[in-house]
């Protein structure tokens, strides 16, 4: 009996060491973690205990801001709900501030790529908030002649499947 407890405790300790080392490695390798730590420079718009917002160094337009959790989180599925809500509140405040700033933009996009197929390149979750202007030549490609326009019953079936997957 005691041996089993020791093994589990030892496994727990080893798991925590591996988890800690992985987190330390990620903090040293991830460009956004390095920005959070202060080992890389950033033009900071906002910082608190949960998130940080700073200027994108490859902006779509002047005023392009990235909002990130200060803890390393790669994907939306791994993001704490309260931190996610806070992240979006900060992004919303930035979106409201952009048209009031010297840029006086005509619109704002918020964009989050989650996973390789979605175009995620930096695997530290980040929400883009950037000003838009008519004729700024940036846009999401949307094919208006989609090959399949689903019937309502198909949409209902897909909605039910997603609803069941909500946790």
Predicted regions and their residues:
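HIT superfamily nucleotide-processing domains
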Residues: 12-167
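Extreme N-terminal basic, low-complexity initiation segments
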Residues: 2-12
């Amino acid at each position: 009996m005691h041996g089993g407890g020791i093994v589990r405790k030892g496994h727990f300790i080893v798991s925590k060491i591996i988890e800690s080392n992985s987190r330390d490695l990620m903090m040293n390798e991830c460009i956004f973690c390095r920005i959070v730590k202060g080992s890389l420079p950033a033009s900071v718009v906002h910082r608190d205990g949960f998130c940080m917002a700073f200027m994108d160094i490859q902006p779509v337009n002047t005023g392009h801001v990235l909002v990130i959790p200060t803890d390393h989180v790669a994907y939306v599925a791994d993001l704490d709900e309260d931190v996610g809500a806070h992240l979006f509140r900060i992004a919303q405040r930035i979106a409201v501030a952009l048209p009031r700033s010297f840029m006086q933009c005509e619109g704002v996009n918020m964009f989050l790529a989650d996973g390789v197929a979605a175009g995620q390149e930096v695997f530290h979750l980040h929400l883009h908030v950037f000003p838009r202007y008519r004729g700024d030549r940036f846009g999401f490609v949307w094919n208006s002649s989609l090959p399949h326009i689903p019937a309502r019953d198909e949409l209902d079936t897909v909605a039910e499947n997603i609803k069941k997957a909500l946790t």
